Each structure stands twice: as C-alpha cells, then as structure tokens.
Amino acid sequence: MFEYMKGMIVEAQIDKIIVEVNGIGYRINSSINSASQVKIGQVSTLFTHFVLREDEAHLYGFVDKEELAMFKKLISVSKIGPKVAAGILSTYTPQRLGAYIVSNDAQAIAKSPGVGKKTAERMILELKDKIDDSQVEYDQNFFNHENKNNNEVVDALMALGYTKHEGEQAASAVRDTSLSTEEMIRKALNWLAR
C-alpha cells in the first residue's frame, strides 16, 4: 500500500520514528538500527510495510530496502509477527541474520527478544532457501569458528578409522554452529552409522 515515505523526521525513539509528510505526523514502527540512523530535523526516506490486523493497523519502516526485505521474510514465518520481526532486526543487521540462517545458527538467532530456540529453528527451516549470498555477511571470526569445528570433527573421525572423505561428508551433513565440537562428533558418528 505504501512503498515509502519521504518527510521530515520529527522524533526518533528506540522502536519508532515520527515522520511529518505534508503536515501530517506518521508514527512508523521500526528497528533500533533504523531509528538510530535517522536525524531529527532532516528529510529522510523510509521504506515501509503496512500491517493490517483485525483490530489494528501499523506502519513499519526502515532506512534501507534490505532491512525491509528481511522484515517481510521474517513476518512470512509462522508465529513471527511484525513486532518480533522488528525486534530481531534490532538485534542483527539483515546481512548478519542471513548468515546465521544460512549456517543453521539457531542459538545466535534465539538471542533476539521474543525468539526461543524452536522459533529460531522454524525460522531457519522456512527461510534458508529464501536467503541468497548477497544478503549474507560473514566476518573472519565467523569462518574461523566454523572451519575449526569442522576440521576437529573430520580429524576425530579419521582417528576413529574413517576416511577423510567420509569425515568431510559427515561433518558437512551435521554442521550446526550452535553445537560444541563434541556434540557434532556424536551427530557425525550417528550419521555415519545410519
């Protein structure tokens, strides 16, 4: 309904932004990330999504299209409403959240307000195929931690008599950054025994 709003920023709080457009002040619910990027007294553009429920109507807006796109993906997940989605985007950038989804890191996602482990796992299940590499941000520590765990799992499996190829296949099949190396080894052994 509303693609974007361009107007004077009148107020910016933790989770909302007031924008004046043609003499009308619109309250736009947002993430902490977007609210912290706007400047009071300046003209800004917010990319918006209108949420209409039985008893209420809300406008959600973000400073960039990537955050709006991730917001729309999040609210498409069952049991994640717009308020929880905005809270998740207050915790992580869309790119970092995308990295956690792609790497099955339910533990990191569950650190967001209103998100438990089951909701995080459901989010990963429903969104993993909808995230492309341009929407993902990895830093060197992210890769180092993941590779270290994988290498340790492969080494342990080789010490138990499996080939390097078998170890790599099993480690790849059970990769989960929320698990300790020991738990991944156990899961890899179960996977190999199937």
From Swiss-Prot:
Annotated region described as Flexible linker, given as residue ranges: 143-146
Signal peptide: none
Region annotated Domain III, chain positions: 146-194
InterPro entries: DNA_helicase_Holl-junc_RuvA_I, NA-bd_OB-fold, RuvA, RuvA_2-like, RuvA_C, RuvA_C_sf
Compartments reported by the entry: Cytoplasm
GO biological process: DNA recombination; DNA repair
Keywords in alphabetical order: Cytoplasm, DNA damage, DNA recombination, DNA repair, DNA-binding
GO molecular function: ATP binding; four-way junction DNA binding; four-way junction helicase activity
Residue ranges, annotated region (Domain II): 64-142
GO cellular component, one term: cytoplasm
Annotated region described as Domain I, given as residue ranges: 1-63
Entry function: The RuvA-RuvB-RuvC complex processes Holliday junction (HJ) DNA during genetic recombination and DNA repair, while the RuvA-RuvB complex plays an important role in the rescue of blocked DNA replication forks via replication fork reversal (RFR). RuvA specifically binds to HJ cruciform DNA, conferring on it an open structure. The RuvB hexamer acts as an ATP-dependent pump, pulling dsDNA into and through the RuvAB complex. HJ branch migration allows RuvC to scan DNA until it finds its consensus sequence, where it cleaves and resolves the cruciform DNA.
Family note: Belongs to the RuvA family.
Subunit details: Homotetramer. Forms an RuvA(8)-RuvB(12)-Holliday junction (HJ) complex. HJ DNA is sandwiched between 2 RuvA tetramers; dsDNA enters through RuvA and exits via RuvB. An RuvB hexamer assembles on each DNA strand where it exits the tetramer. Each RuvB hexamer is contacted by two RuvA subunits (via domain III) on 2 adjacent RuvB subunits; this complex drives branch migration. In the full resolvosome a probable DNA-RuvA(4)-RuvB(12)-RuvC(2) complex forms which resolves the HJ.
Domain notes: Has three domains with a flexible linker between the domains II and III and assumes an 'L' shape. Domain III is highly mobile and contacts RuvB.
Protein name: Holliday junction branch migration complex subunit RuvA
Gene it is expressed from: ruvA
